[in-house]
Amino acid sequence: MAFILGENSGGSYTVSDYVDEPELIVDEIVSIVQDAAIENVFYSDDGETTASAIIFKQRVSPFLSESPHEVAEFEEIPTADIRVGDDKVEKAFKIAEGLRVSYEMIKDNRIDLLSRGVEQLANEFLYASARQGLDRVKAATDEHSQVVSATTPWSTVTAEIGQDVLRACAMVSSALVDGDVDDERKAALGYTPDTIVMHPSVWYNIIGNKTIQAAFIGANSGDNPYFKGFQPYKPWGLDVAVSQYVDPKQVFVLQAKKPGGKKFLDRPQVTPLYSPYGDSSIGGATMEYRADIMERSIRALYDPKAVARIQVG
């Protein structure tokens, strides 16, 4: 659906209105980007920080170095060490973009151009955010061999999509600790995959797949996602998250918000419209106004094995 400026604020404004009431454009941009970042599926919100870099340790085990001991009366209770990985460092990253509104756009009331500009600015911001988050996840799945190759490309209607997804689920749920353990039953990291992330085009390949459709013949036909769409259908018991910013050749299976965390030096901020080169009735020396969006944040992958990637094509 196309974005139409003014819909979210319940009014129909001219370009001049946005210049006269500079805060209006802030609400419009925030309405698009708020809670829309696909990386939020992979990263928990770890709050604010003032540091430009963080040192962290990846999770290597859900257990201490030793099991509890049976102790005799008056015997000292033994202690065990916390198992941690090597130190890793992630630095802050700033993304920012600005949108210009010309004097001519104001005088000619080119609300269509302003609508496109606001939508494109928000999309650029979301894309940059997604790339920062997803590129790290992809690199981690390669590093830790958390990759499943599809038996057959998913664009093929006879592809064994379900088997590929279940292999990825098994990979996440059976991910093992690094190093030795005192009990093999403690070797699993204990993740529970609950979410599948994909490009919208991949979803349509799924609901058109012959094997998937066969499951809805007869009594289950009323629940067929072919007709009902995404919700409330949960394939393989997984929540479905789709985004145009995910590579169409990749699908991610994960425990939501478990792989990593994101700390903010500055949460996403949008400026009201302002004239950058001197305020005047015509927009300063360059006869323009602008609005900016920026964010400074740090992303860290604490549990890289909580996600698996399926190469679907």
Give short role names for the model-derived ranges:
Residues 1-38:
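N-terminal alpha-helical "arm" segments
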